[in-house]
Amino acid sequence: MSVAGTAVRINWQPRPDKAKLGLVEDGFEFSASDIHAGFLDRETLHRILAAQSAQNIETIRRAAEKTLLERCGDTVRLRGLVEFSNRCVCDCNYCGIRRSNRAVKRYTLSLAEIVECAQWCAAKGYGSLVLQAGERRDEKFAAFVAEAVRAIKAETCSTELPEGLGITLCVGEQSEATYARWFEAGAHRYLLRMESFKPALFAALHPREQTYAARREALATLKRLGYQVGTGVMIGLPGQSLDDLVDDLLAFRDLGVDMIGMGPYIPHVQAPLGGADQIGSAQARLGLSLRMIAAARLLLKNVNIAATTALQALSETGREQGLRFGANVIMPQVTPVRVRSQYTLYDGKPCLDDNAEQCCECLRKRIESVGRRVLYQAWGDSAHFAQRRALAKA
């Protein structure tokens, strides 16, 4: 279907008997035999996202999976997820832990608790973890994160991981000095989601003091400092079009991101974002999210893409489907169960009551059920990052 190391183009074949002017899906179908070296243009990306027929969707899925296997291999990278604090200074309109939500019981794990979670991940061979929290920008928080990163590195060194666990941070917008401080402490990946690359949609999701320009600048700063940079968007937002999602995909490409974490929009009952009555069904948002994963894989080839927990919130097999459509990262929960229910960004979050051991075994079975295998005792860094670093040196 495609050749390793080359781009992919999907040609469309008209179906004259069903062709209707102005409708993207009707009148076209994918032909697996006609995928060849080339590039994915805006029109093709739009048609991938618009696809509805089972035949077209399966062809897209198979092409994305083939690209993944050729460019990244068949392993799934695990990132133990430690949601270490739900205290947040931001007031995002879609978020369950927003500053104004007085119904949330706030918590912050102790340093010892965070290190214990990290040691558990290392013992299970995860190789990496994600430290995620609500946004804070005070010195106490910056110092605490730096101390946690250093402690994790010191306490998780082994023969297999001589530098300790790989660490991804997901703690929002910070100053360049703070980003540099954490990088020097030992964090080497950073996930900062845009939620939408359309300025008007970004503004609808965030309060006025959070600006589109500041978040774009933060992503550029992270890349300049040497982080592996990740971002992502929500899919199926009120007022969001397929053209907006195509713009998101092209923004991933133009920014040269190394990692993508995106998933379906799921409302939270205590968040004020309007338009919940305008969003598609759970099935429709799940399907569109899977096609976004496939489109990102076909467009970007060798980045790391997460099969997010939100996929499983809409379908029991959501994360497995994400893997089959081109994802290669899963973030199993290791947050202590006693606080996990207080970190709900959206309603219906799964795995709130399963302990880390249960999540570990469950995900291993899920991964193996789709013919993939877990990558143990390795950071599982983005192949895209290695490629761009090699190019920079050259």
Briefly describe each language-model feature range.
Residues 1-54, 122, 253-394:
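Auxiliary Fe-S-binding modules of radical SAM enzymes
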Residues 39-76:
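An N-cap/entry alpha-helix motif that binds or orients negatively charged groups
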Residues 49, 79-82, 102-105, 129-142, ...:
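Glycine-rich, proline-tolerant flexible connector loops at the mouths of alpha/beta enzymes
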Residues 64, 92, 131, 192, ...:
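Conserved, mostly hydrophobic/aromatic
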Residues 99-115, 121-219, 228-235, 258-261:
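Core AdoMet radical
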Residues 129, 136-139, 164-170, 174, ...:
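Conserved strand-turn element in the central/C-terminal portion of the radical SAM core barrel
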Residues 174-182, 238-252, 313-324:
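Catalytic cores of alpha/beta
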